[in-house]
Amino acid sequence: ISCSLVGSEMCIRDRSRHTVRKALGILEQDGYVEAFHGRGTYCSENVRHIKNSKNIAVVTTYISDYIFPRLIQGMDNVLSESGYSIILKNTANSRQKEARCLEELLKKDIDGLIIEPSKSEMICKHRNLYQNLDKFEIPYVFIQGIYSEMRDKPHILMDDAQGGYLVTRYLLELGHKKIKGFFKADDMQGLERHKGYVKALQESGIAYDPDDVVWFHTEDRKVKPALMAKEMVQSGQLPDGIVCYNDQIAVQVMEELEKMGVRIPDDI
């Protein structure tokens, strides 16, 4: 049985027309084939998704940067122990690339999908592809973020708001009052960490000032934080401390401040 199941039902040797029709009826009922009037009988799309491949697709925003090598290695270790293989893809935090990855994976035989959504704070415009995963009963789980309209789907998240709160609280407990924040605007993690930052300030009786927050996006993440740190020094308005979205941004900001002669942690 390949693309066209049978050109003529009698082409199956030594089987009656009745037997062939009955067999095709059972296959169609079970979803293995589709019959088209006047065209023939074909393998169903469902055949590609029987889920016995022992392949798990893993889609992350990046592969070689930051925390991702260890993250992927951890998943591979666990899956390998259970006899599964990884199909690895990355999106570079691009919605278009995420959609292409899903389209490609829907053409493959996979048993499940682990995916980090791209720009998770924005509306998902390719939700139909996730609906196809549901249609073919391919299980999937979101990691590190989730689209707001898909919160009913399985997901594993850090408590980003609590993380932002604890970091800000730490600086406040050291006696710092003027605390700037550098946060990512197009990922859910950035907004949640910002919420924690605001909560800590408010609990300490410090009014939240939007001007104390630098927002950046995926496209300018390697430029804007350093640029804004430089402008901050040039303005002569140094804060007591800075809360950064993650370690990468913290290092970028620190390096720029040190270039400008700012001592860390003495001055900031």
Language-model regions: role of each:
Residues G38, T91, S118, G145-I146, ...:
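Short, ordered loop/turn segments at secondary-structure junctions
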